[in-house]
A protein has these predicted regions:
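Short glycine-/acidic-enriched loop or helix-start segments at secondary-structure transitions
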Residues: 23-25, 49, 69-71, 104-107, ...
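Short, glycine/charged-enriched secondary-structure capping and boundary segments
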Residues: 27-29, 55, 72-75, 108-112, ...
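Conserved beta-strand segments of alpha/beta enzyme cores
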Residues: 36-38, 111, 145, 164
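A short acidic, often aromatic-flanked loop/helix-cap motif at beta-alpha or helix-coil junctions
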Residues: 44-48, 120, 154, 173-174
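Cysteine-nucleophile active-site neighborhood
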Residues: 60-131
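Amide-donor transfer/coupling interface in amidating biosynthetic enzymes
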Residues: 127-248
Length: 248
């Protein structure tokens, strides 16, 4: 009804590092809910607003750069400060995907290190024993397929009492983690749509990582595998979004 739509109209800030990495499927759901969306394209020189209190939630997306590349991408310095302010000081809801996951991990005291090996493809995620108690991921199956496309990962969060590990893959421990009960790092790509893989394959850094990992011509196979699993991945994205809305 009209009434619930207006009452649900939240202010969301979306931080992007390359224009083709958006909240994707979740973006469509937010638009259907008439959310007020502010997108900041950092790689094009846009700045994160200084008044973060106006936002109910923050999405921080992926990108071809890495967290340590502050010399090449000086805006990373301010971005980390703003994430720290939003998550630690203001204690507001945050979803970080891939690079956005790594930025959260670094901000709360973890290390971002090279993945050995990189994870690229449609791969398995296994949830931790405690995940059913989590108010965002409790609708997920205990294991599921997810799209991975990363060469770095978060480590060394074990000693942070505010961090809960929620999901891992065979080679990456911190696939899903949360800081307290409002900020989530998600290393894989839950937000993908039908055209995501073919679009991302046009980014030189992504194409190189893909071919280094899976060989020449891997994009087509990867895309087909993604299409086979798309329905399930979209259901997971929808469940994540429905639950995330409740904490906004």
């Amino acid at each position: 009804t009209f009434k619930t739509r207006t009452s649900m109209s939240k202010n969301i800030i979306i931080i992007q590092h390359i224009d083709i990495e958006t909240p994707g499927y979740i973006l469509d759901l937010m638009q259907e809910d008439n959310f007020n969306l502010t997108t900041i394209e950092l790689d094009e020189g846009e700045k994160i607003p200084s008044n973060l209190e106006q936002f109910d939630g923050m999405f921080c997306m992926g990108g071809p750069m890495d967290t340590w590349m502050e010399k090449d991408y000086p805006w990373l310095i301010d971005e980390k400060k703003k994430i720290m302010e939003f998550v630690v000081d203001l204690k507001k809801p945050y979803l970080g995907f891939c690079l956005g996951c790594q930025l959260l991990g670094e901000v709360i005291g973890g290390k971002v290190v090279k993945s050995k090996p990189p994870e690229i493809g449609i791969l398995d995620i296994s949830m931790s024993d405690n995940y059913l108690n989590d108010h965002i991921f409790n609708r997920f199956h205990s294991s599921f397929k997810a799209l991975q496309w990363h060469s770095y990962e978060v480590q060394d969060l074990e000693n942070n009492n505010n961090v809960t590990l929620l999901g891992s893959s065979p080679t990456t421990k911190y696939q899903i983690f949360k800081y307290k009960n409002h900020a989530y790092g998600i290393q894989f790509h839950i937000e993908i749509k039908d055209n995501t893989v073919s679009q991302w394959g046009c980014v030189p850094e992504y194409e190189k990582a893909l071919e280094d990992s899976l060989g020449k011509g891997a994009l087509k196979k990867f895309d087909l595998k993604a299409q086979e699993n798309m329905k399930l991945m979209n259901v997971n994205a929808e469940n994540l979004y429905k639950n995330f809305k409740k904490i906004l």
